[in-house]
Regions:
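Acidic, glycine-rich loop-and-beta core segments that form the ion-binding/anion-interacting portion
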Residues: 1-33
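Charged (often Lys/Glu-rich) extended helix/loop segments that serve as interaction or gating elements
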Residues: 28-177
Length: 177
């Protein structure tokens, strides 16, 4: 998962070094940061339902009803996102490889220690707030998922799940001679 940062301590240290640099450089400079990940990574989780649990000689696969088209960061950057089984949080821990429904490089996590997983369980991928919808695609004509906001214990649908009609709406029919 993401490593937490003491933003106040970091600010003090950077400020001191930056001010020294400006004196050395002989000019005041404006320094700006893009804090997107810091602000929103922890603000969202990604949930996916387990469709199949499959034991092989080398691992136990938990196949989820999603793929890199919804949450590409683990595949694109080989990033780690903690995964919990919210349907069975107190279950016995086992090791799983969590994979998606798209053939190519669709592995959310390999050899992860997760509370025992059964078909229909819901897995939670943590620190996903900055990486799902903004990086999602309609790869292989897959729909984009719904988005739900939870505020003070109440859930609100803030974006509907796509339909095939949503995908086709921007298509133009042309006649070729």
């Amino acid at each position: 998962g993401d490593i937490s940062t003491d933003i106040e301590q970091l600010g003090l240290q950077l400020s001191e070094r930056f001010n020294d640099f400006c004196v050395e450089y002989g000019k005041d400079i404006t320094l700006m940061f893009e804090p997107g990940k810091f602000l929103v990574s922890d603000a969202g989780v990604f949930l996916a339902k387990v469709n199949v649990v499959k034991q092989t000689t080398s691992t136990v696969f938990a196949h989820v009803g999603s793929g890199f088209n919804h949450f590409v960061r683990p595949m694109m950057y080989d990033s780690y996102h903690h995964i919990t089984n919210i349907s069975n949080p107190e279950g016995r821990y086992r090791y799983y490889s969590v994979v998606g429904y798209i053939c190519e490089t669709d592995t959310f996590g390999s050899n992860r220690r997760i509370a025992e997983i059964s078909e229909e369980d819901v897995l939670c991928f943590h620190n996903a707030g900055a990486y799902c919808f903004s990086m999602a695609s309609n790869y292989n004509s897959r729909y984009l998922p719904a988005e739900v906001m939870v505020h003070q214990g109440k859930d609100y649908l803030i974006r509907k799940r796509q339909t095939i009609q949503d995908i086709l709406n921007n298509q133009e029919i042309i006649t070729l001679s």
